[in-house]
Each structure stands twice: as C-alpha cells, then as structure tokens.
A protein has these predicted regions:
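Active-site phosphate-binding strand-loop segment of PLP-dependent enzymes
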Residues: 146-199
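N-terminal small-domain helix-loop-helix segment of the aminotransferase-like
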Residues: 9-99, 107
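A short helix-loop-beta submotif of the ANL/AMP-binding
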Residues: 135-141
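Helix C-cap/helix->beta junction micro-motif
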Residues: 26-29, 136, 195-196
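Short beta->alpha connector loops at strand-helix junctions that form conserved
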Residues: 123, 142-146
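Conserved PLP-anchoring active-site segment centered on the Schiff-base-forming lysine
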Residues: 111-133
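Aromatic/hydrophobic pocket-lining residues that form π-stacking "cages" and hydrophobic walls in ligand
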Residues: 19, 23, 129, 189
C-alpha cells in the first residue's frame, strides 16, 4: 500500500522556522546565537501572570475541552478590554480564542473565501501569510508597498493590475515594516474597497 502525499506538501516551507532549527542546532554545539528569526519574548512573563497560571493549573475543573470558541468568561473580558481601551464593545459571541494567530487566520480565511479566490497582500510582508493562503488553495496577489508611500498598500497599482481580488489582508502593525495603519488611512482603504465592490 502506498501512502498518498497531498499537493500542499509542495508548498514552500516558512523559512524563519528553518532558520530557527538551524540556529538551535548550532546552539547545541556550544555556539552563541542571537535569535532574530521569530518574535520570541526576551523576558519571562510577569510574576502575577505566572502565579495566575499556576493557580489555574490547580483547578481541575478547567482541564479538558472548552466550548469551540473558547471560554465565555475570557471572551467577555476581551470584549470589555476593547471597551476600556478603544471605546467599542464587540459582541463577545463574535470573539474566538485560538492557540495563536496562524490558526486564527486559517479559520478566518476558510470562513470568508473559497479555494481559488485571490487575496491581495502587501509586499514586503509576512511570508507565512502567503504560505497559509497557498495551503488553503487561495492565491496571494502581491500589492507593492514602498517606503516613499509610508509602506502603505498601493491601491492604484492594485486597481490597475487586473481583476479585483476577492479580499485584502491588512496587518497593523505590519511585519516586517512595523507600520501601524492610521485610522484615516484605514477609512480610506475601506472606502476604496466599498467603492470597488458596492458601486
């Protein structure tokens, strides 16, 4: 019997993880390595966080599965955080807890798009987004972002490059540029999208 290998096996590896693996191999030989490949924290969590985690581990009622979207109390607290910090209160029923942003992106892409859909993303940009899109059968369309435009996506280039994409992925702050999209710029991008789609 031969094991079938899926086509997603041909998706290029996320190079940062390969660099991290190579760096760990060198560390094991005694070499001093400065890790710049992934955004690992350089300091431990605050004592209060470690204490709360330790207490939570002792509560056996919290062990095991939670509801699919995450513990309601946590989702409600996240909604309250948005009210405290940003003055908006998202419906906590629309908040999902994921074990990292990559799974959150995968779930969002699966919910919003179909295989073959085109998603516009800025370049330079975080390479893992392209890998994830390819794994889900989505097609990343690269939008040039340049220093002389404050690394914002060039919407004119997007509009003139062919058929409009089925979606746009915006990251703020962006990796690797660090750009945070200002409210006015985000409103302009949203208005542009609505103008293209809504007529």
């Amino acid at each position: 019997m031969t094991l079938k290998i899926g086509k997603t096996n041909q998706i290029p590896a996320f190079l940062a993880m390969q660099v991290m693996q190579d760096a760990q191999r060198l560390e094991a030989t005694g070499q001093d390595i400065m890790h710049l490949e992934v955004g690992q924290p350089s300091t431990p969590p605050p004592d209060a966080v470690n204490s709360a985690l330790s207490t939570a581990l002792g509560r056996t009622a919290s062990h095991g599965y939670s509801v699919a979207l995450g513990h309601p109390a946590l989702r409600q607290r996240i909604s309250a955080h948005y009210q405290d910090w940003y003055g908006i209160t998202p419906d906590w029923n629309r908040i999902a807890i994921t074990p990292g942003s990559s799974l959150g992106f995968a779930i969002s892409f699966l919910a919003a798009f179909d295989a073959g859909d085109h998603i516009a993303i800025a370049t330079p940009g975080y390479p893992a987004y392209r890998n994830l899109m390819a794994a889900l059968g989505l097609v990343p369309d690269l939008i040039p972002a340049r220093a002389d435009q404050a690394w914002m996506p060039d919407l004119e280039a997007l509009a003139s490059s062919g058929p409009l994409p089925d979606g746009i992925l915006l990251a703020s702050p962006a990796n690797p540029t660090g750009v945070v999209i200002a409210d006015d710029d985000l409103a302009e991008i949203c208005g542009w999208c609505c103008g293209m789609v809504c007529g």
